[in-house]
């Protein structure tokens, strides 16, 4: 069998060892399904190709995953879903168990949350209008359904290949009967992903009695069916409580791959497959083992860890095949897609270098396969489509992080070439950035954010250039890494839009968060601190030594009112700090660069308390493919990657009393927190392997070699901890 980075084939009989309560029991997949979280409650495996679960059939931003907890009806169960994105797509191959003929059957069914269940690798719900209990579980590339029908001669499974959400639209669909228990088909669509092709194969536990198919609303009787909107009804006679099971295998390459995906599940024992999925989730969750007396904290923590394993997702089938954007079939060992890099480069991707180290080479090689086809690294790739969503070229820090952490399994030279070429392309304003030293606001919207982010990405390229001895590039990328200064206005103390003539955009209101503007999903306050590679340089541009600290203080204390047509992404406010959107995520930790780590502790504890909960609306903003959750995981265990590609994690205020990190080497890194409580939130002292540790950060290397980190907490700040620049995190402008 083919090997994957998680399991060889499908381990249907994998049994978790160890003692104590299972960690999967602390995961609540409904967290984030309400409000603006945009998560889904369906069944999947870590990074699985299949995400099978319910769709409400409601159009709208808060249904970007196809499901929102506030809804009361279900239109079907589709096999692909996005986790926490701000744009809706996927929801491919919608199926619905129902009772009734095609002429009489209703489109959707009501349901009650009291009759709905979800856990890692499982989803179940009673469809009230049909008296059908629907359950589903999954392997990596195959979904397994179990439907308990009432006594009826018109029990039906409906395939609605024209089903789509938001801007997505089916362009062509296909359905063919192989025999009374086997079917194949495809759905091609366009939307956020312009060229999306999903092939599927179906195997039933019981032969159908009859099949009725509509093509573009017209009933057809033929051997195979092709049209924009294919609707197929598979009819059965059932006894009361009779369960019909169905396997649906997927491939993004061809029918052969979809049929092969069915072979991941070689049993009709639904409960066995469900247990196997839960066991696999248990194994992955156990890579971070925390100890806390607070059950709520444990539920939020392990649901957060679960969320970080929902993206990226496997794109290649069991043969290694996948389709490129032009329709060619390519082959790769393990190809991954769905990379929300503007979000995940900040903390979700760095977290994977700790918890999923063995997966990182597959991710980077997927980026390089994308580069081979497109000529540059992905920005926001969805099923290998470049959506060009958001700003920056943030595959660069992800690749740089892997190289600087000495993670092997990909070609460093090719990776550097891809990084450099992505920065030297003439699209997305890079030519303006090179020519002016900033993005002019009269040439492009979101110019301030783009300038800041390009400067950071260029710093990442600089680090790799130094490591690989590409000295011919170091001068130019050193210069470019400082271009953020070109959009800073000393008079107002804010980063501002600047036109080609060098003049600042007027009028200027730092509270205005509108679209379009010089800022991405925010205002001048929220985009005033993104210089993660050079916080010392940012401090120096203020007229007084404590100017940056005062500005940070003001961020958290000024009015939360904003002007303009504020986008809903700008949420979770403390003053103008907006935790519901990613540009704010590193800011609370910046105090440690200013030798005021106790201020970081205050804000980090406040953010964890206010903006994370174990309820459907427990996320204050979009989950964004794991980034919102990754912030919590890092913060709860006591540190955060302010500069994601630096290999440094800045201390904050650990929420849990202990965390044991299981490392790829088989060793562990233990974090023991002494005298921890709601009031004892300030770090008093730290030891690493029983030796005094005075730095306000810890390195990736120190974590991955294993050891014991002991953090002593207290109710008052220790004015002697983290107060010297030499013990602080690195900055480009700070020589050590």
Kindly give the residue locations of the regions a language model identified.
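Bacterial Sec-dependent N-terminal signal peptides
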Residues: 1-21
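Accessory carbohydrate-recognition regions in carbohydrate-active enzymes
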Residues: 21-349, 353-397, 403-452, 460-486, ...
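Conserved catalytic core of nucleotide polymerization and phosphodiester-bond processing enzymes
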Residues: 673
């Amino acid at each position: 069998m083919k090997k994957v980075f998680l399991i060889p084939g499908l381990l249907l009989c994998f049994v978790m060892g160890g003692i104590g309560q299972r960690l999967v029991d602390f995961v609540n997949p409904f967290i984030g399904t309400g409000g603006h979280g945009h998560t889904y409650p369906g069944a999947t495996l870590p990074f699985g190709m299949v995400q099978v679960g319910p769709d409400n059939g409601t159009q709208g931003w808060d249904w970007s995953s196809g499901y929102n907890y506030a809804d009361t009806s279900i239109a079907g169960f589709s096999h692909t879903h996005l986790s926490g994105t701000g744009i809706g797509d996927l929801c491919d191959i919608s199926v619905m168990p129902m009772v009734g003929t095609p002429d009489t059957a209703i489109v959707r069914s009501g349901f009650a949350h009291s009759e709905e269940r979800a856990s890692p690798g499982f989803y179940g719900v009673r469809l009230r209008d049909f008296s059908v209990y629907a359950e589903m579980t999954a392997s990596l590339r195959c979904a397994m359904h179990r439907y308990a029908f009432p006594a009826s001669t018109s029990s039906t499974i409906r395939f609605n290949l024209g089903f789509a959400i938001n801007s997505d639209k089916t362009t062509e669909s296909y359905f063919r009967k192989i025999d009374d228990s086997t079917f194949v088909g495809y759905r091609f669509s366009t939307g956020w992903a312009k060229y999306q092709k999903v092939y599927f194969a179906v195997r039933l536990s019981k032969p159908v009695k009859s099949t009725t198919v509509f093509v573009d609303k017209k009933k057809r009787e033929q051997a195979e069916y092709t049209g924009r909107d294919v609707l197929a009804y598979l009819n059965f006679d059932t006894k009361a409580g009779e369960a019909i099971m169905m396997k649906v295998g997927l491939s993004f390459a061809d029918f052969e791959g979809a049929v092969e995906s069915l072979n991941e599940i070689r049993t009709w024992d639904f409960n066995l497959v469900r247990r196997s999925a839960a066991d696999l989730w248990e194994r992955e969750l156990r890579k971070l083992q925390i100890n806390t007396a607070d059950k709520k904290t444990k539920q939020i923590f392990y649901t957060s860890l679960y969320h970080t394993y929902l993206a990226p997702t496997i794109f290649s089938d069991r043969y290694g095949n996948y389709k490129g954007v032009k329709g060619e079939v390519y082959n790769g060992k393990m190809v991954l897609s769905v990379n929300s890099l503007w979000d995940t480069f900040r903390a979700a991707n760095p977290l994977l270098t700790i918890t999923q180290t063995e997966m990182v080479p597959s991710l980077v090689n997927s980026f390089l396969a994308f580069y081979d086809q497109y000529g540059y690294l992905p920005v926001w790739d969805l099923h290998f489509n470049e959506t060009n969503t958001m700003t920056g070229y943030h595959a660069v820090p992800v690749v740089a992080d892997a190289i600087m952490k000495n993670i092997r399994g990909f070609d460093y030279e090719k990776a550097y070439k891809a990084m450099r070429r992505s920065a030297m392309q003439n699209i997305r304003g890079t030519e303006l950035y090179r020519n002016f030293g900033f993005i002019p606001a009269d040439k492009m919207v979101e110019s301030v954010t783009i300038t800041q982010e390009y400067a950071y990405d260029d710093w990442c390229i600089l680090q790799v250039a130094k490591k690989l001895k590409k000295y011919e590039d170091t001068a130019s990328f050193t210069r470019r890494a400082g271009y953020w200064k070109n959009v800073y206005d000393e008079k107002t103390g804010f980063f501002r839009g600047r036109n080609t003539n060098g003049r600042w955009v007027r009028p200027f209101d730092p509270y205005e968060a509108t679209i379009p503007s010089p800022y991405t999903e925010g205002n001048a306050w929220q985009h005033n601190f993104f210089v993660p590679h050079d916080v010392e340089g940012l401090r120096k541009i203020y007229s007084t030594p404590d100017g940056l600290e005062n500005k940070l203080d003001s961020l958290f204390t000024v009015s939360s009112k904003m002007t303009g047509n504020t986008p809903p992404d700008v949420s979770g406010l403390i003053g103008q700090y907006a935790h519901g959107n990613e540009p704010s995520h590193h800011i609370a930790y910046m105090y440690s660069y200013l030798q005021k780590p106790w201020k970081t502790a205050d804000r980090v504890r406040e953010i964890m308390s206010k903006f994370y909960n174990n309820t459907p609306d427990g996320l204050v903003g979009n989950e964004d493919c794991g980034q919102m959750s990754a912030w919590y995981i890092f913060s709860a265990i006591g540190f955060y990657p302010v500069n994601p590609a630096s290999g440094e994690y800045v201390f904050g205020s650990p929420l849990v009393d202990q965390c044991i990190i299981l490392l790829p080497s088989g060793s562990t890194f233990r974090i023991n927190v002494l005298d921890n409580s709601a009031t004892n939130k300030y770090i008093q002292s730290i030891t690493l392997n029983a030796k005094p540790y005075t730095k306000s950060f810890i390195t990736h290397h120190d974590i991955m070699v294993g050891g014991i980190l002991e953090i002593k907490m207290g109710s008052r700040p220790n004015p002697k901890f983290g107060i010297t620049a030499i013990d602080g995190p690195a900055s480009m402008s700070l020589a050590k």
